[in-house]
Amino acid sequence: MSYFAFFYGYYNQITFRLQYHHQYVTLPYSTLNFALSLVEKNYMLFFYLYMHIFIEKHNQYFFYWYNPSNQTYKSK
């Protein structure tokens, strides 16, 4: 019952803000558009950072599987 009340309250809040308070919609929309435009302009930088994180994480798993000692991976 509380599960439905939770979403019912959010539905009321959202509909009220869409009806009477348009600034609640426009400001987050414009902010997200601005952030996505920065990503569009610098997508290779974000890809580079993401791949560094991905490779480091999987390097930890490989090091833990490969190394026979009881030492955990320490990043430089």
Curated annotation (Swiss-Prot):
Partially overlaps IFH1. This is Putative uncharacterized protein YLR222C-A. It comes from Saccharomyces cerevisiae (strain ATCC 204508 / S288c) (Baker's yeast). The lineage of its organism: Eukaryota, Fungi, Dikarya, Ascomycota, Saccharomycotina.
